[in-house]
């Protein structure tokens, strides 16, 4: 029989994180869990895994997985065996990641929240973070909120679950360009009645990327022209100018002829990769057909 934890309703952590970075992948996993919940469940909870900075002031949430639970007005039941089992499986693929906190798809903070937070803090002895995403109406803009807990009372060890949740700053980021491309493809499917899209080729992706770059350059050019003409003069304009100058100093200076040569070389590499991929695909298909004949 699996071991369970039953929580009955009851009435500044030093070294706690002050900033949380949430990857888009982890946020997507949380939303996927919310969409797959049972109809009678008002919210779902789960474990956040990632890495901590050396001083513990910053936490990066890289992945998340669901933890089964049931909740009523008087008690909450959590499967204690499920969490370590899932963590062991997760660390086979990501050995450097540790439990950094937990999440809930509800912004409500109550006594149960304090007790669950205390459980996650005791797992490895480091201050846990709590992330909430209001997933009741997914049509609204999603705004993740992150908290740390500050114990209340003279002796916190005797008042388990009595704490105050203190908001801390957070940001959502993409791990790499592959994450952004995948999420943009998924997001574009919502415009289709079938909720599906056809993946474009490498050349089409390259064309779309160049079009986006040209659009951004046109916006920057228009903004700079407004600043020069005096239509836009503010502290924000100075900050934008400094960022543009910093970006230009980091960009290697290339004339149009060299830039065209480099672009053509890159285009040839892309075409060669596409050609080789199609060749290997054809060879594998032919080999499979010959194998069935033999």
Curated annotation (Swiss-Prot):
InterPro entries: eIF3f (IPR027531), EIF3F/CSN6-like_C (IPR024969), JAMM/MPN+_dom (IPR000555), MPN (IPR037518). GO terms for cellular component: eukaryotic 43S preinitiation complex; eukaryotic 48S preinitiation complex; eukaryotic translation initiation factor 3 complex, eIF3m. GO terms for biological process: formation of cytoplasmic translation initiation complex; translational initiation. Keywords: Cytoplasm, Initiation factor, Protein biosynthesis. Pfam families: JAB, MitMem_reg. Residues 20-163 form the MPN domain. GO terms for molecular function: metallopeptidase activity; translation initiation factor activity; translation initiation factor binding. The keyword Ribonucleoprotein does not apply. It is found in: Cytoplasm. It comes from the Eukaryota. PROSITE patterns: MPN. Component of the eukaryotic translation initiation factor 3 (eIF-3) complex, which is involved in protein synthesis of a specialized repertoire of mRNAs and, together with other initiation factors, stimulates binding of mRNA and methionyl-tRNAi to the 40S ribosome. The eIF-3 complex specifically targets and initiates translation of a subset of mRNAs involved in cell proliferation. Belongs to the eIF-3 subunit F family. Component of the eukaryotic translation initiation factor 3 (eIF-3) complex. This is Eukaryotic translation initiation factor 3 subunit F. It comes from Yarrowia lipolytica (strain CLIB 122 / E 150).
